[in-house]
Every structure is written in structure tokens, then in C-alpha cells.
């Protein structure tokens, strides 16, 4: 639930962390009794605890459809990511994956850890998929077919240009946005969003992940697969792996900032997409990851640590985002706060400074024009001055820990 040191440094995080921990335990207890659905929801919590929590915002039928959609695409992604599989074997599987989901005898052993279990026991996912309504099944099949074909295309193709980068991100994430919009519409809860707005929702998340995961991806064994476009990185270094070497730090940061600036172009579309949502459950499901994305970009921007180790939002801030995100006003507030943080990190000598500032100012203008930026709102990044000394904070921590133990044992269904 976050380290003691982090909580002492940010005591305001404790209550959101407490609520998140209780919510996580509550979600894990909501596993269905049917074996195939029990497998799917258990696997969902293993492959993505955060997604497993966010999905609980949705109503039962839509939640089941989104759960299966997510697991099908994680399985597809596992095949794509396994660099030990030859191209001759991998491409036909990707191309035919949309048919395999109808076959409850099909499985293909690949991946590691929980992903290997997902692939070995894929018949459970197929059985659950077959339980879904026809509108949900058609949407999942269509997106799986298009994504598999796109992944197959890029198995044999490098990401050379920014257009290639956008196309790849469309296949692996933009289509997720389109698919979710179809599922929301099939549920009767939302109007069908435009493809361009849905695509931007996926691209904003995917580009953030590609930026954040540079070091993990470049060091992948036996062979790395990289998605930073040559059109961007070749302006700064001769080889993409050169960015991780300390002697290239200045150029690496400029390249990183170029990548972040490219990702920011999708933020305005994301704000438009979220502002059009009607249902509070679907809204929270969509909004929380988008706030996490702009928060992660703010941490990565101008930060050499991206090339040295892991850069991610602290768990307490993640808990705060999940706790505080209720309305579009909260989203405008978060995007404004994180764009302010980004703006404060822009070096005027950076070759992309003008473009970066222009994109940040466009985001800030939308947030200001919304009328949501009241003086009473809670900031995501400006910490309150604390009058507590360390002893009082520790006492508070002990009291809250006792409260957490009490709530966990006596109020499991209070959320």
C-alpha cells in the first residue's frame, strides 16, 4: 500500500491509499462462481491490478464484455511480444486470432508467468466470450481481426516515420479506443463516438507507454522491439540504443521531449471525447487512465531517469487520481495541473520548446474555458504545507492502520 517513507513524505496520500487497498480487496472477492468467468476475472487482476479496479466502475454486462475484450487483446499482444516465436509462426496466428476466439479448444503456449497461463488456458476466455451478447461479440471480433492484421504488418516493418508510428499505435491502441466505443454503444449507455476521437484516446495512452518503457524495451532479451520513430530519434543520435548512454544525456533528453510533444497532440481530442460521455461509470473508466497518462508524461518530460530506470507516478498519487476523479471538472483540473507542471519543465533552449509550449497552452485554454478551475478544487501536484512533525505523522499512520484493519475485517461490502 505504498512505502512508509512515501507516506511520511506525502501524508495526504494515506486516505486515498487506504480506500484503494480496501477497494482492491473488495474487487478480488467479487469473482464469479462459473469456472470460465472465475478464470477471466482472476486473470484480469493478475495481468493488470489497476485495470481490474477501474473495470469495477462498470455495470455487470458491460463489465463482462470489457473484461473479455481486454483479455483477448492481452493474449494477442502476448503473441506479438514474444520474440522467441519465429515470424513464420507468429504472423498466421495474429492474422487468424479473431477466429480462434470462437474455438474453445484453441490455445497456444507462449509468453511468461501469468501471460503463459492466459495462453495455456485460453479456452476459458473463449467460453466466456461465447456467453456475451451478439453486439459485444461482433465488436470484439472486428477489432481483434483488424488489430491482428496490423500487428502482423509491423512484425515485418520498422517504425521509420511519424506516420508509421501513428499507424502502429492505431493498430495496437487506437483500435482499443474504437472497440470500447462500440461496446459502450452496444450497451445502450452512450452514443457512438467518432473514430478519430476514439483513436486519439488510445494513441495518447500508447504513446505514453512507449515513451515510459524505453529502457525496458531496448534491453529486452533475446531481441528488442522498439517503436520510437527513426524520423524523431535520428535527429539526435545515430542509433536508438545510444540514448541510454550517459555521454548522450543532453541529446537523449531533447529526443525524449520531442516524443512527449508528439504525444500531447492527442490531449485535446481526449478532452473532447470524455466531455461527451454521459454515464458516470463509463466516464470514470475512461478518465482515470487518461489522467494517469498526462501525469506520466509530466514526470518523463526533461527527465534523464527515463534512460536509467523506471519512471512512474507514485502509488499515492495514483490512488488520489482514482479517488478524486468523479466529473469532467476533475479531469479539466488534472489536465491543467499536469500541463502546468510540464510547462514549468520546458527549457527555452530545447529545439522543440515553441511547439511544446503551444500544445500545452492549447490544453490549458480548453481547461480554463471550461469554467472548472475554481479556487476550491484540490490540486493533483501542489502539495499542501503540512504543520505536522514526524512524530505526529507516525501516530496518525498507526491510527489509520488500525482503522484500515477494522474496515477490512468488518466492512467488506461498504464500497
Curated annotation (Swiss-Prot):
GO terms for cellular component: endoplasmic reticulum membrane. Keywords: Endoplasmic reticulum, Isoprene biosynthesis, Membrane, Transferase, Transmembrane, Transmembrane helix. SUPFAM superfamilies: Terpenoid synthases (SSF48576). Its EC number is 2.5.1.21. It is a multi-pass membrane protein. Pathway: Terpene metabolism; lanosterol biosynthesis; lanosterol from farnesyl diphosphate: step 1/3. Its main location: endoplasmic reticulum. CDD domains: Trans_IPPS_HH. GO terms for molecular function: squalene synthase [NAD(P)H] activity. Its cofactor is Mg(2+); Mn(2+). It catalyses: 2 (2E,6E)-farnesyl diphosphate + NADH + H(+) = squalene + 2 diphosphate + NAD(+); 2 (2E,6E)-farnesyl diphosphate + NADPH + H(+) = squalene + 2 diphosphate + NADP(+). The chain crosses the membrane at residues 281-301, 392-412. It holds the Pfam family SQS_PSY. Induction: Induced methyl jasmonate (MeJA) in adventitious roots. It is found in: Endoplasmic reticulum membrane. Component of the triterpene saponins (e.g. ginsenosides or panaxosides) and phytosterols biosynthetic pathways. Catalyzes the biosynthesis of squalene. Belongs to the phytoene/squalene synthase family. PANTHER family: FARNESYL-DIPHOSPHATE FARNESYLTRANSFERASE, SQUALENE SYNTHASE. NCBIfam families: squal_synth. This is Squalene synthase 11. It comes from Panax ginseng.
Amino acid at each position: 500500500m505504498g512505502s512508509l517513507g512515501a507516506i511520511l513524505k506525502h501524508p495526504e496520500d494515506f486516505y486515498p491509499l487506504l480506500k484503494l487497498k480496501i477497494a482492491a480487496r473488495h474487487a478480488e472477492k467479487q469473482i464469479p462462481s462459473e469456472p470460465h468467468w472465475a478464470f477471466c476475472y482472476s486473470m484480469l487482476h493478475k495481468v493488470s491490478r489497476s485495470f481490474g479496479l477501474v473495470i469495477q466502475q462498470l455495470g455487470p454486462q458491460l463489465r463482462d464484455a470489457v473484461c473479455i475484450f481486454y483479455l483477448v487483446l492481452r493474449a494477442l499482444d502476448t503473441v506479438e511480444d514474444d520474440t522467441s516465436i519465429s515470424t513464420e509462426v507468429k504472423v498466421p496466428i495474429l492474422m487468424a486470432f479473431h477466429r480462434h476466439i470462437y474455438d474453445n479448444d484453441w490455445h497456444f503456449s507462449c509468453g511468461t508467468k501469468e501471460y503463459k497461463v492466459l495462453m495455456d488456458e485460453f479456452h476459458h476466455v473463449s467460453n466466456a466470450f461465447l456467453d456475451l451478447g451478439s453486439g459485444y461479440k461482433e465488436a470484439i471480433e472486428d477489432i481483434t481481426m483488424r488489430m491482428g492484421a496490423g500487428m502482423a504488418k509491423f512484425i515485418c516493418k520498422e517504425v521509420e516515420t511519424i506516420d508509421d508510428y501513428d499507424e502502429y499505435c492505431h493498430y495496437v491502441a487506437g483500435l482499443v479506443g474504437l472497440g470500447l466505443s462500440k461496446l459502450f454503444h452496444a450497451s445502450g449507455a452512450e452514443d457512438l463516438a467518432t473514430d478519430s476521437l476514439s483513436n486519439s484516446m488510445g494513441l495518447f495512452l500508447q504513446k505514453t507507454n512507449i515513451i515510459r518503457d524505453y529502457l525496458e524495451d531496448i534491453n529486452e532479451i533475446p531481441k528488442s522491439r522498439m517503436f520510437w520513430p527513426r524520423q524523431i530519434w535520428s535527429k539526435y543520435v545515430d542509433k536508438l540504443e545510444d540514448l541510454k548512454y550517459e555521454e548522450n544525456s543532453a541529446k537523449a533528453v531533447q529526443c525524449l521531449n520531442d516524443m512527449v510533444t508528439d504525444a500531447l497532440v492527442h490531449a485535446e481530442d481526449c478532452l473532447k471525447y470524455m466531455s461527451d460521455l454521459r454515464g458516470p461509470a463509463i466516464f470514470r473508466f475512461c478518465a482515470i487512465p487518461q489522467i494517469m497518462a498526462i501525469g506520466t508524461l509530466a514526470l518523463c518530460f526533461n527527465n534523464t531517469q527515463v534512460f536509467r530506470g523506471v519512471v512512474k507516478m507514485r502509488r499515492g498519487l495514483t490512488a488520489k487520481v482514482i479517488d478524486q476523479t468523479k466529473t469532467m471538472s476533475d479531469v479539466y483540473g488534472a489536465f491543467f495541473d499536469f500541463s502546468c507542471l510540464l510547462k514549468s519543465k520546458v527549457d527555452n533552449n530545447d529545439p522543440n520548446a515553441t511547439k511544446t509550449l503551444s500544445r500545452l497552452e492549447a490544453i490549458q485554454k480548453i481547461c480554463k474555458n471550461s469554467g472548472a478551475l475554481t479556487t476550491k478544487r484540490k490540486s493533483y501536484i501542489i502539495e499542501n504545507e503540512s504543520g505536522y512533525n514526524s512524530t505526529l505523522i507516525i501516530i496518525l499512520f498507526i491510527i489509520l492502520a488500525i482503522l484500515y484493519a477494522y474496515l477490512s475485517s468488518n466492512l467488506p461490502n461498504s464500497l
